[in-house]
Amino acid sequence: MEKTKKKKRKTFTRRDFLKGFGGGALSAAVVPQLLAHDIDSLRTKKGNIPLFSKKQISLTVNEKKFSLVVEPAETLLHVLREKLNLTGTKTMCARGECGGCTVLLDGNPVYSCLYLAVRADGKKITTIEGLATKEKLHPVQQAFIEKDGYQCGFCTPGFIISSVALLNKNNNPTLEETKNALSGNLCRCGNYSRIHEAVAAASKNMRRA
Amino acid sequence: MTNFKIAEPQTIDQVTSLTIDKKDKYKLMAGGTDLLAEIKDEIIEPEVVVDLKSIPDLSYIKKEKNGVRIGALTSLARLAEDTLIKNEYPALHEAANSVASPQLRNMGTAGGNLCQRPRCWYYRDPQVKCRKKGGGRCFAFRGKNKYHAILGGGLCYIVHPSDLAPALIALDAEISINSPKGNTTIPLTNFYTLPKINVRKENILAPNEVLREIKIPLIKKEEKSTYSKFIERGTWDFAIVSAAVKGTVSGGIFRDITIVLGGVAPVPWRLTKAENIIKGKKITEDLVRKATREALKEAKPLEENGYKKELAEIVLYRAVLSLL
């Protein structure tokens, strides 16, 4: 399901293509509200259990409200990337082992690849795109740049989200606490020490601010 | 991920009154971290996923006069952060804190952790039809078995992956199960079953039964507990061997002690023999190692996992030392 759609070789870049596709999927997903009534039910002696093959959900992503129709097997990661065009959250292992898809769900970091979109109904999500305010980067983003907290950069959104979750709860973490908080994120370039330095720098800047 | 329908029950009674007519048609989902990974890996293909989180009020930690009650849908993160658990049941606190990663602890639940499926790589490989998946043999027996069971194997050599289970069993926890026949409360240790009982399952739960609550009795005065987990990586992983220990200790002597090992058998493994040897004697490394060896005499390691016997001695010694 999270497999990248086959790309067509045209003059577009891959990113343009994927973004264009995502936008199309968004409008297609939001318009046919009738689909939301695709409800069946399981009859039991203790009443009927609502059974959905499609469901209308409302969620807040980066302080913007979205209402859309999702299928039960769609993950939050899929919805963010393919329907809401927020491709900053990365698909890596897609089975809850690497942390590339980490987002904040009501303030807590979760793997969006193992979180069903139907469950995000009524929740507040923060992705990497929601951290900067206008032209000003979040202190953690700034620190990752200044301290070279990335090499290839693919795991970076996940690491930044986990770091923000840590610093929101503990603005002066020890190295041990930082390592623990980031233990659910993998960096295959092995840039961990720089990442930990970036978190320490961000923590210092945030306390000063 | 193969598509499925999602059912959102409002009460546990609705779940227990589901008729199970076709194999694996329904699967109950708590946190979903294990279930969805199994669906993605095409190990199971349920038609309907029953979302237990749509049932209100199954997430709580309540202190009462005869112990603490934990709702099955309480997140592992909440369990790990709770000060009552941390102060009174350190084994449970340490076990919850050692499960997976921060993200997974925010998603996973106490009940789900107790009911998770094994990590055996033959079981997790969709191409392999082992006994646990209805096939005719256990591929670990003569295959790659570094992480497999040294005790209680036979038909299937999985180890139970739960961290909470050994800790809770050492703490004498009980669980409440809602079933179509009524509701029961049983000791957690009776929940788990060996492959010889039913090779397809790790516990007694039927597809339409719900593990609703965990109950831990009050700790006795001066009772201490701990959970020690050996993993192969520097960061999060499933236990290679773990030891949960509870007891009362003074002057370097345990007046009573309960020991449960994880990572060595298809069920959490109580070391009664070792308990009897350790009880009442001055703790030394020699004593703990000898007691473990004695208790693991019946172990039948496979080609690659004999090291677990010696590792268990060390892990248990570390756990015991931390309580002195």
Indicate where each model-derived feature is located.
Chain B
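C-terminal structural segment of proteins
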Residues: 1-324
